[in-house]
């Protein structure tokens, strides 16, 4: 009876995909298989009560699952720490403790297009879920000479050294030579990977459809407004740099003599994050977030300015009305996540913490109010400066209208009018929906929809059911099976405005035109968004990516973000002595982001190339083992085949004339430096000129080449054999 209890954990917006395949639904293509599994959301791990997807969380036995499938597992790549009795668990630790470690023995299957962002520790943290955070469990099962911790440490060290090489030396082959054999053995044991490039090159896609051709990306840099003598980006940035944002750090103003009263705020007590650290983290995020919001839209920036201004003014009012210490400040009132983008909302600053109150009598509220009043004055000035930028004078919005007009009048695929517009912020999505829906309806008779983290579905079609599944089905009817799901319905949506809540896992390839209305700070997000339409089986011959960039040089833009982070970091060190309060994503490698964002201005980068380094596609041999097992099922006589087999195939551009040798070392004990991954077999590719085209240390490349040369061929090429 093992493996009967299965849990699928996925982002909430992807639950319908999973529910379809287990339910008795007309659009379930595998209904006869009668799959049985529970579907819950990543966010449910932090919940103790209530209903979720028809399951009562109060009574759920989290520890009774034989298998847990984690969709979009990269959301758990930052890991977690356990220390002390009062350690507060983040989502990662909840999963580890409630599901994997508790109850019956649980196997873990993780699905992700981006398991590694820009460091190998991302992969290690995800793998730790499978071995319950106990490395000794994995070490016993691996055929390696080193522990898993040492393997990843050495791999990251090799990668760091390789990344500093000159560009012409920083090749995949060079990195493969420096990585330890045990690292390959580890990945080969636990990963199976496929990429777009790999499928296109080595697989026959005639049965499942092709990938569409990517047109060169369009990069646009509209100015802020067409108003004469109006404020520009640099004017706003200078004002933003003057903000202290101490509204987010009240605990820094607790008087030293009163600190003992608030020991929970100022000391770790085993927690990985103190309340002071959490406040500083939110303050730093908000300082950077103001830049992000401005780059997204004037409307989004204005709303955030107004919210912070109201928060400050309300707090100043509370201080002024303070009498005899009977007034307390509730910190949770000033730590809401609604102003932040999808990634920032998932940091521990918002998911970890408890209600804490500070008595104003215990604060140096005079100094605090002085700083608050300075910020209030500058925010009011900002508010006045952008007040005149209405939609009519919003150059970025008007540029978007021009794009839509051109796309409709000159479609890149015959008759296809569909457009997806992505933004990082729901406020920008609301602003775009209000204006784009009116423009598209009045000028072209097109229907528009919106999906955000808080809006499951909103559309201009009267009486259309406003839920995620219906909206996506009406927007991408072929890929979503509308003819089965909504038979007889003529409702169709042509423009979809969305946040990153649907940037993962959705098949929307009926659409051929995707606009990034704001460029996400994490370059991987940009490619994930484009992946909604850049999918195998697309009905479109061509697809187009459009990116809106800030109205300034990219280096200047990235340096600006660096200056803001540095300024906030200095203030953190001054107040707390701690310079490591922000999450790994936000620390980021600015050079990595700079390089990738520059590439994205000129080309559409494959997601496996986004690390400027290596894809796990370059490492694993698992797929060849699967090919071999399948071949042996069909050809049982392979065991009696004579030695010395050979054949002849035509050369190609990637495989010039020569010989690929597959040899066997008769001495099994000899494997120099333990570097040959397929010992005792050795492969080498020698060109017609006698040069080594590929040596035995890169069997993955040789096996890929052989597969490509032999694909679709059952007999030797007679012309070449004569």
Indicate residue ranges for each PLM-predicted region.
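Short glycine-/polar-rich loops that comprise or flank the Walker A/P-loop
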Residues: 2-5, 33-36, 64-65, 103-107, ...
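Catalytic acidic motif of RecA-like/P-loop NTPases
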Residues: 74-81, 114-116, 295, 426-427, ...
